[in-house]
């Protein structure tokens, strides 16, 4: 159990929630809003991935996302918990982190003295999920608020995110690939293997002809970049392509020892950016 000290974790909705978190009052998802074809879709437990992908396919415009307001974060932080943590999308990719900081400042003016810490994941999707798992592990071990922050900051500094997408257009059209040097023509069926930089931007690591070869190359990149892998939990999220996720899981298990592998479906924001057929990994 979590002992007497009451904790709260707030994760923006780009971060996939584990099934047990969905039923746990210690966890709350703060929703981003998705806009597709003039319709606003709240990325909460009502999100319907199949319906969303259908709408994206039918819409001539590229979908967009809007981050939660500072007031929404303020409301989430305004609770009786002794320790409150937020885990946001990379500040390089979204305004969610800044919104959370503003929300904390607003609450501090009205009700000073709360212990609230906001982690910039420098990642997205299941990168945020793994950070949430690390916070939970530290809290369950009885760490002080300061020690949790220190340990999780270290974890974030050592975490890497990787992805292979069938379709990079949503990222590209929303300006999320502006820092990427070498993107290749999709006409050649070349699929880039993408990754995260230390600051939380997106970079290209490799490429292959066809998505299955790209997944195998990604597995190689992950094995190469992961130290002490036998002590680490690796997470995979996929957008409507379970068989690809399993292909990748098997490739990873052949290449490296891991403590555990978690496989989740992408929620709303991750589905929007990964697109149908995309696979994301964090470790």
Regions found by a protein language model. Name each.
Residues 8-72:
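N-terminal glycine-rich anion-binding loop in soluble enzyme alpha/beta folds
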């Amino acid at each position: 159990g979590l002992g007497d000290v009451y904790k709260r974790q707030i994760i923006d909705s780009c971060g996939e929630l584990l099934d047990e978190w969905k039923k746990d009052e210690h966890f709350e998802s703060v929703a981003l809003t998705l806009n597709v074809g003039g319709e606003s879709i709240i990325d909460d437990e009502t999100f319907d991935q199949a319906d969303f992908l259908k709408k994206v396919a039918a819409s001539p415009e590229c979908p967009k996302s809007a981050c939660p307001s500072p007031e929404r974060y303020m409301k989430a932080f305004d609770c009786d918990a002794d320790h409150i943590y937020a885990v946001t999308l990379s500040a390089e990719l979204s305004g969610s982190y800044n919104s959370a900081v503003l929300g904390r400042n607003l609450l501090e003016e009205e009700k000073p003295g709360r212990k609230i810490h906001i982690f910039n994941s420098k990642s997205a999707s299941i990168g945020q999920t793994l950070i949430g798992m690390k916070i939970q592990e530290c809290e369950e071990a009885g760490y002080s608020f300061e020690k949790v922050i220190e340990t999780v900051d270290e974890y974030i500094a050592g975490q890497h995110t990787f992805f292979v997408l069938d379709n990079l257009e949503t990222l590209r059209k929303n300006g999320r690939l502006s820092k990427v040097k070498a993107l290749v023509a999709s006409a050649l069926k070349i699929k880039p293997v993408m990754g995260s930089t230390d600051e939380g931007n997106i970079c290209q690591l490799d490429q292959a002809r066809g998505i299955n070869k790209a997944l195998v190359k990604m597995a190689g990149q992950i094995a190469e970049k992961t130290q002490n892998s036998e002590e680490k939990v690796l997470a995979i999220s996929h957008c409507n392509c379970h068989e690809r996720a399993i292909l990748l899981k098997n490739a990873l298990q052949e290449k490296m020892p891991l403590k555990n592998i978690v496989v989740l479906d992408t929620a709303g924001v991750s589905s929007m950016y990964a697109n149908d057929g995309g696979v994301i990994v964090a470790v």
